[in-house]
């Protein structure tokens, strides 16, 4: 059996995705040109230059998600099923010696996020309890398990972060887009909370841990009341006040 060639595999997959998008772009440009010849105009004057940008990017062998798009361009492109416009995470599995920097550098040209791991180490790690895991990672000079890094990479690629709700018998994380305001975070929990949003009681994760509980956070006056324009921070502890 031939030795694995991860760069060739990445190139092959990337090429297939780019060719699929290239066909969509070329077909769309042809239709826009036909509309211009028949009607003397196109429905959206911003579309032809965007498609030309996409064409140049794909012909250069680069995925569309590497382009910086403004809000209007993002909305316009969402009407098409472009594969390379979607965020991509490449996971590189290696032995304990690690992955070469050249391979990581190349993978970064095709992906939003790159995670390198050793599956054998992760398998051994999964058989240990929490305390043993920490000792095992420390011995290997690894700061955190690959599973944690993969979750963080997925959140990063999708533009998400988390806030928490804390109750007497449950603590739960909720994912929202970065830049989300408090009512949107309320809607992630339940649509009624967003519809009847009044205020968000919030504190930081660090304050909660250092204080030891929400009651202690309130005693230390570190619980804040935030309104509709509050931008949710990663790790916020939030309790929604609402009325419907």
Cite the ranges covered by each PLM segment.
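Conserved P-loop NTPase nucleotide-binding/switch module
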Residues: 1-18
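Amphipathic, non-membrane alpha-helical segments in soluble helical-bundle scaffolds
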Residues: 15-18, 22, 48, 144
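Conserved phosphoryl-transfer catalytic core
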Residues: 22-30
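C-terminal-of-GTPase-core extension/linker across diverse P-loop GTPases
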Residues: 31-233, 238, 243-244
